[in-house]
């Protein structure tokens, strides 16, 4: 997400016409497993169950994703095949909170920034892709943050 945010900023500031942004995770199995084991974040059952009542931790995996980004006007003018647009992007952290005990405050700051930049309300969005690591505390805080965002938008539930 951070790479996408930086790429968007470069495009909006006219410092670049095309940006490639993305990331990969190819953890060194021994060190990554040891680190997450020390944090007690690994699933004891070896299965990640995001947003589930039986979630007990995460499972380390590998992945990669990259995006070619242009300003919409430039992509249209070039006849590019446009798969998606980024209307708003937000980034925040919990300012010193424990890695395994996230707080809603930082998550809400990021979501509010993205919605504000896009000029949208939460009910304008059809799909939310959650972080959802499968850690009971992290997933619960993420759901709490989303609930609060919608409550602000629609009033008490």
PLM region descriptions:
Residues 1-157:
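Condensing-enzyme catalytic core of the thiolase-fold
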């Amino acid at each position: 997400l951070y790479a996408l945010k930086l790429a968007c900023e470069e495009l909006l500031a006219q410092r670049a016409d095309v940006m490639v942004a993305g990331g990969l995770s190819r953890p060194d199995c021994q060190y990554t497993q040891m680190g997450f084991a020390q944090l007690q974040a690994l699933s004891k059952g070896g299965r990640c169950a995001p947003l589930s009542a039986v979630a007990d931790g995460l499972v380390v995996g590998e992945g990669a994703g990259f995006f070619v980004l242009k300003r919409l006007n430039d992509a249209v003018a070039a006849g590019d095949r446009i798969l998606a647009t980024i209307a708003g992007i937000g980034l925040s952290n919990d300012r010193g909170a424990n890695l395994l005990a996230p707080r809603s405050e930082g998550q809400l700051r990021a979501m509010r920034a993205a919605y504000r930049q896009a000029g949208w309300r939460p009910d304008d969005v059809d799909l939310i892709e959650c972080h959802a690591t499968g850690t009971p505390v992290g997933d619960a805080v993420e759901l709490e943050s989303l609930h609060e965002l919608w409550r602000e938008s629609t009033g008490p539930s």
